Amino acid sequence: MSARRRLLRWGSWFAVLNAALLAVVGLRYLWYYSALQPSLAWIYAILAFLGQMTVLGYTPFLLLVPVIVLVPRPRLVLPIGVVLASAVLSFMVLDSLVFAENRYHVGVLTFLLLAPLTWAFLALYFLVGVAIEAMLGLWVWKRSAVPPRRRIGRYLALGLGVCFVASHLAHAWAEAHSYVPVTAFTRYLPLYFPLKDSRRMAKLGLVDEARVREHRLVTALGRPPEGELNYPLAPLRCEPRRPMLNVLLVVVDAMRADVLGPSLAPRLTEFAQGAIRFDAHYSGGNASRAGMFSLFYGLPATYWDAFADLAQPPVLMDLFRRYDYQLGLFSSSPVYSWVVELDRTALARIPNLRRETISPVPGAAARDRILTDEWYDWLGRRDPSRPFFGFLFYNAAVAFEPPDDYPPAVPVPPGASEWVRRHSRYLTAVRFLDALVGRVLDDLARRKLDERTVIIVTSDHGMEFDENGQGFRGHGTAYSQLQMHTPLVIRWPGRPPGRVLRRTSHNDVAPTLLAELFGCTNPPSDYASGQSLFSDSQWEWLIGASHLDFALIEPERVTIVRPNGYEIRDREYRLVQNPQLPNAGLRAALAEMRRFYR
């Protein structure tokens, strides 16, 4: 047997065994696939899973083929094959862990956000992978010297190839027929790009042409719009109302709506009784970047890239600067972090921007305390003859980092899981921040500024701990009410307190300030997607966004649109098995996502 032929045989068997190894690691993906109910979904999931693991297992071998053909030397080929296979294996381990935690796969943004400790673990995974792959590769190399007696390898390769082809054909059929139990599985496999050919199936008479039109609509929604920004659509016509009020915006990162109560947030609950509380308020995203964008701009966060590329601030911040507001901007987490990047969007072009909170003591709680002290100091040094805009962005809740000596909000039973412990730390951090924000409000009253200041307390998004039993935890993982429903409490001098039950969103905050504070007479549609919070309107649909996808949120359902497909979930965030696309809402959303491009 020639060296080249033996190396090709070794590479093929090495790929098959690597596919089996990856399948063992990848079983974690199947664990979270909630739609495995109909038999067709079971069959497809198994075929797609085996086919994709085969593709990933064979990828190092395919990269090795040119080397084997040109330089058939075992001492060169085997080490390269082991390193490539180890890289794929360590990637799979990391991706499965990320997916289990966040329900999305590893991407460029994920690598940018990895902590140094995670990089250390990734290096450890790689070294362990090298050891495993080296032993596996040497064992296969020894076995490859024995001439094959049966054609097991050919039959095995044929079977895996059939799995690959059959799964892609099944997906093409399922997508054309909107069969969600099959199409929903796409997002569970890493680097999986199944066949999509609805148009050809329609030409062959295998599917309804109407289904193809629906598919085109979703495909259009999944593509980011292109073009130059046209923002605002018309020059602003504003005449501020004198004397001009101060504005204080307090954002508690990841504070969800249902924690605003006397047990966990007594100070803010007391504040809400003398203010306007919006009970059905939603963020524009399930992560900080999208939530903060919708809060400052009043636009869907699908525009984030376009504004960030130009460092284009919102008209709200332009007006604060135009009318000589003093800006007291204090964020616990760095404004330049990849998570939010406020320095490229809402706080862009601000001279001497305070970019981060520096604390000699590690931890979000320590930074939050320093942030508050620096706010007090700034407030005492400001020019009292000019109005101010204050922005306080607290971080302890989203980081699950209350002070070490702070009494826990709920007890943690012995042997509790990590997420049970996180839930306790989250609630404790909320209680800690409630007290901290309460002192900020007391300080305003002591300085006799509360009657001349619009005070807004809200959050950028919520937080989930698998209360729905769907396996979603944290934030940025789902468009459920737990991650989208946020508190909003506003005390506006001269307006009576009350509770608003109609649906509102972050998109409505900027239009409210422009109309009521700056006296802008433009229709809100000139610069935002929302309406004034003090109007009688409510949204019938809302565009929610995350880092990787977006959703059309309606009162009774959520349509999640991803680059590789879509899924529809009900109010309890359960997957809808045979959905009907909300065509009217999707077309309106598509128009809104393109309205501010030329």
Question: Residue spans of the language-model regions?
Answer:
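Transmembrane and membrane-interface helices of multi-pass
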Residues: 1-193
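Active-site rim elements
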Residues: 43, 47-49, 303-307, 361-363, ...
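Active-site-proximal alpha/beta segments of enzymes that process anionic O-linked groups
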Residues: 163-413
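Short beta-strand segments
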Residues: 251, 282, 329-331, 388-396, ...
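Substrate-binding rim/cap in mid-to-C-terminal beta-strand-loop elements of soluble/periplasmic
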Residues: 286-297, 472-526
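A solvent-exposed, charged loop/short amphipathic helix patch at secondary-structure junctions
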Residues: 406-427
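Histidine-centered active-site microenvironments of extracellular/periplasmic hydrolases
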Residues: 445, 449-494, 539
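Phosphate/adenylate-binding glycine loop and adjacent helical scaffold
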Residues: 527-598
